[in-house]
Amino acid sequence: MKAGIVVFPGTNCDRDTKLACEFFGWQADYIWHDESSLHDYDVIFLPGGFSYGDYVRAGGLAKFSPAVLALKEYVKSKRGFVIGICNGFQILCEAGLLPGALSVNSGTRFVCDLTGLSVNNTKFPGKINLPIAHGEGRYVAPENMMKDINELVFVKYTDNPNGSTDDIAGLYDRSNKILGMMPHPERAVFEETGNTDGRYFFELIEAELR
């Protein structure tokens, strides 16, 4: 398995993501934001952080980068799997690769905590816990889109920490090859962190690509 981890100015979860990939025996390479081709990789990660300082809005500038343009070509070619975590989820929505948008948390405060989640996948053990850390994690979408969007939901908050519509914490696109989520599975892989629920997500990616 060969993973590419896209690094923008302001990305800060790239190392965590690389270590998590290597825990599963994957080759993991950093990809700078000016890269114009991603086709060498089985899975592409857009990790968390504050791409371009979150100027304009979270993900609002990253969507214009060469790497995101290359990501769109990667998606068209059906080459592999794409996962955007936290800021990566924001970028996927800004780029139009996932529906809806991520807005400022209700209460306007940055939230950093361990949160309960309910996962819509039989490979997961019902309820899990993962870290979150974001100021713009409130998922929103037009009301007339919500019926279709709810069919794409992969993970929901059990105790909504940010005011997300319908408790949405993460969702797929229609192909089930693009996944965006606000919680951080890469921060819950090693036993030293006291929580290994993030391993289920990496195991899911392996299963998707078999």
Model-identified regions with their sequence ranges:
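N-terminal beta1-alpha1 cap of cysteine-dependent amidohydrolase-like domains
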Residues: 1-85, 92-99, 105-111, 143-145, ...
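Amide-donor transfer/coupling interface in amidating biosynthetic enzymes
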Residues: 41, 73, 102-210
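Active-site metal-binding loops of divalent metal-dependent hydrolases
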Residues: 49-50, 88, 135, 185
